[in-house]
Each structure stands twice: as C-alpha cells, then as structure tokens.
C-alpha cells in the first residue's frame, strides 16, 4: 500500500505520523522544507492548541462547527499535547488557555515531525509541486518533476493565505476536477481596513478596550481585549476574531472602540470633571492626558468637535458630554478585511458536506482524504485552527 500526502504542513505532517508503519508514505511539498507556515504561526512561537474544554474548542470554530465534533472528540486537545510531550516537546499554558512549546520556538514543533518522518522512512519530495491528480483504477499524480501512482491520497495543501509559505490554492482546480466543491475563499483572522485615515495612529496599541461591531445598527460583536492601529486600519487579537466573523457578512458595518469599558457613563463623567477641576487653566488637550494615550487625544477631540487649544474652564456641558460619548464610543467605518495574501488563515475551501467527518475520506472519490485548512472550516485565534489541522490529520492518517 502506498500513500501520497500533498502538503507538508500541520495537517499533512500529523497524518503521516499516524499512517501504519508498513505503508509506503510519500509527502509532496513545493517548499524547500516541511512546516513552512507552521514555522511562522504564533509569531514564531507556534500556538499548537488551546487547553479549554472540548466543547469550547467547537464553540471557537467560526464556520461549520458541527463538522468538528468527530475530529475534536476523536483527537482532543489533551491528546495533541500528549502527542508532543511524548515526542520530547515540553509545553506550557498561557493566558487564554493557549498552549505553546516551553521553548517558545516553533522550530521545536517541526523537529518533532522531522524525527517521526525519519523513523517511519517517509519519502519527502520537497521543491516538488503537484500539478495534476486524477483517478482511474488508482491515483495518478503528475508533479513538476515526475509522474507517480498511489493507492490512496491525502490532500493537505492548505488554504490561500500567506501564499509565500506554499498555501496558494494552486491545487484547487484539481480538487474540483475530482468532483469536489470549493466554497469561495476569503481572508480570515486578518487586519481590518477602515474608511478613516488612521495613518498617524499606526503602531498605537490599546489594551483593555472594548470593541463593538454593528451591522445595520444591530450589535454582532462585543468583546474586551487588545488591538493595534495599522497604516490602513486596525489589527490585534480582538480584530482578528472580528475579521473572521465579518468575512461572511454584508451590510452597513460600523466598529466602535470603548476606551474605558470599566467605567459607566456616570463614572467616566465624574472622572472627566475631576480632571477638569485639577486643570482649569490648562488646554483641554493637556487636561485629558491621563484619560487616554497621547496619540489619541487629538482624534478624540476632533470627533467631539472640541478645539484642542480651548481652556478647560471654557468647556461647555454639551462639549463635555460629547467628549464622554466619544471616549465610550470612538466610531470607525469598516471597509474590508485585509487582502487574502496577508490573512493568517483563509475562510472557505472544500465543502464539508462532501467529506466524512469521522474519517476525512471523500464521499465522492473513494480513497481520497482531506485534512486541515483546505477544508471549509475556520476557527478564531487561540490555537483552534491548528487543533483542527492536527485532529483532521490524525483522522485521515489512522483511517488510511
């Protein structure tokens, strides 16, 4: 029995780890090394999973969460952690139940797989792109170098995000030729581009702020956390999560930042009055310097229609109310998610209705399997997407 795995990313590598040792395994990847995207995940630290309850893993899937019951319960986050621990990788749990290598090095995760592949005598075909897959009595693969035949094939070629890591969607036309449906690919876990010019705020980081989002005046998101301004918009943990939700939404989208989520309107007004009382002869720009960070003061005052050079003792109650409202609701206009090339993951992929969730085998083509980001499932930030890659890779591997 010989097996081809197309893609040496998280899902493909996990699949190879669990295929029977007596099978002949071939992994194809057009990169020069395995785990290229894995290497950069979690800013090079590799957030391998999340240690929450399994049901919470499922709740942190944005698209087609029902498909994840079998994968997540058959190969749980605890089993993922045990897999790496038993293969010599020590792990640690950080804020938000995020699991990382104790070394903080994604390269150590890749070393685990390198060792496994070596012990299993896996045939690695690096710098070799699969151009064509078709099936008659068996599977035939045409690559940039050669032609091969295989009994079974696992497609783990990834999505369309970060194309320079290899997940560029180049195999998708072959997947459709095999009879499968590819749902539209969109950016997920990405920065958000705004209508407003925020270039002067680039690099400004905000912690413990509230982020709300409204579609046609209906609130669809309300979370507290961190974000950062970019040259064209906003990014950071809260924004990444919101971007995935917005990837499949339409309508009039407004985003609002609550700079003081811990204060009620009344308590914030009391705080402003106290600062005004202490700084009556100063300009409003200087008087509110303790309420928010320096770079946000002028944009806040502009939104509140207050002259920054106006003395505090000249500020009217109407202006003070405006100031309070802007601090509690600094409004921004959504334009789009950042381009797919710059997204952490892609939304879309092979339709889950065409895949058996308990085995990852195609319902259309016998002996064809899918795992990882190529499937139309995407999760929020926090280790959930890698858990999906590992769980589906495991199922594909053990069911070969």
Q: Predicted regions span which residues?
A:
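Glycine-rich active-site loop/strand segments that organize a redox cofactor
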Residues: 43-93
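A conserved short coil-to-beta-strand element within the FAD-binding core of flavoproteins
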Residues: 126-138
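Glycine-rich loop(s) and the adjacent beta-strand/alpha-helix scaffold that form part
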Residues: 152-198
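Short hydrophobic core segments
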Residues: 4-6, 28, 130, 148-164, ...
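A glycine-rich dinucleotide-binding beta-alpha-beta segment and adjacent secondary-structure elements
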Residues: 126, 298-378
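Glycine-rich FAD pyrophosphate-binding loop
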Residues: 20-43
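An anion/pyrophosphate-binding glycine-rich loop and adjacent beta-alpha core
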Residues: 32-34, 40, 48, 54-55, ...
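N-terminal Rossmann-like FAD-binding beta1-loop-alpha1 element of flavoenzymes
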Residues: 2-27, 396-400
